[in-house]
Amino acid sequence: MAKVLVLYYSMYGHIETMARAVAEGASKVDGAEVVVKRVPETMSPQLFEKAGGKTQTAPVATPQELANYDAIIFGTPTRFGNMSGQMRTFLDQTGGLWASGALYGKLASVFSSTGTGGGQEQTITSTWTTLAHHGMVIVPIGYAAQELFDVSQVRGGTPYGATTIAGGDGSRQPSQEELSIARYQGEYVAGLAVKLNG
């Protein structure tokens, strides 16, 4: 049984929705055990509420437990072309895992969201840098998801990983096409994890 973790940070719920779709896709793979968790919030409850943050029910992960999984699919909103501060803070606590090589050879993939589309690819590839330092095997999705060829509407999605465009005010929710790409990413990564570890 290959263990797959979908690990995310979501303030307004866009990445949470994408994470559910990623997990749904991963769960289609026989031999994959899929877990969804989120990183801890670093804002105070008062500031989080004032900023309009969405309460979420996924359990909170600890950095040390990452070593228990064969594949980790990370989800983060874009903050100036980088991962969110909450995800950065979480990954900055993985020094012990790095020192012991605990994540070496494990699969890693990334999905993201942006307000207007700017930075979606940069966020994924800049997150890869941290994962590469851990010796993780980075898994992009390429152009296998047919929705990536559809230019008839505004949508996220890159060969690097699934993305969604939330709109400048955050009112746009992930489209069916974006969720389909996210499901593909989950299924693809879980399938590889089973082949390598199942």
Curated annotation (Swiss-Prot):
Quick one: which residues bind NAD(+)? Answer: Y12
Concerning its family, UniProt says: Belongs to the WrbA family.
| Start and end residues of each Flavodoxin-like domain | 4-189
| Top-rank taxon | Bacteria
Lyase: present as a keyword of the record? no
Question: Which Cys residues form disulphide pairs?
Answer: none
Protein name (record)? NAD(P)H dehydrogenase (quinone)
Q: What is its EC number?
A: 1.6.5.2
Cofactor, how bound (note): Binds 1 FMN per monomer.
Annotated Gene Ontology cellular components are:
membrane
The record's section on PANTHER family has: FLAVODOXIN-RELATED PROTEIN WRBA-RELATED (PTHR30546), FLAVOPROTEIN-LIKE PROTEIN YCP4-RELATED (PTHR30546:SF23)
Query: From the record, what ranges are coiled-coil?
Result: none
Q: State the Gene3D superfamilies in the record.
A: 3.40.50.360
Catalysed reaction(s) here are:
a quinone + NADH + H(+) = a quinol + NAD(+); a quinone + NADPH + H(+) = a quinol + NADP(+)
Q: Which UniProt keywords apply?
A: Flavoprotein, FMN, NAD, NADP, Nucleotide-binding, Oxidoreductase
Q: Which organism is it from?
A: Escherichia coli O157:H7
- List ligand-binding residues for FMN: 10-15, 78-80, 113-118, 133
SUPFAM superfamilies in the record, alphabetically?
A: Flavoproteins (SSF52218)
Among Pfam families, the record links this protein to: FMN_red
Q: Which HAMAP family match?
A: NQOR (MF_01017)
Signal peptide positions are none
Recall the taxonomic lineage recorded for the source organism.
Bacteria, Pseudomonadati, Pseudomonadota, Gammaproteobacteria, Enterobacterales
UniProt-recorded Gene Ontology molecular function terms: flavin adenine dinucleotide binding; FMN binding; NAD binding; NADH:ubiquinone reductase (non-electrogenic) activity; NADP binding; NADPH dehydrogenase (quinone) activity
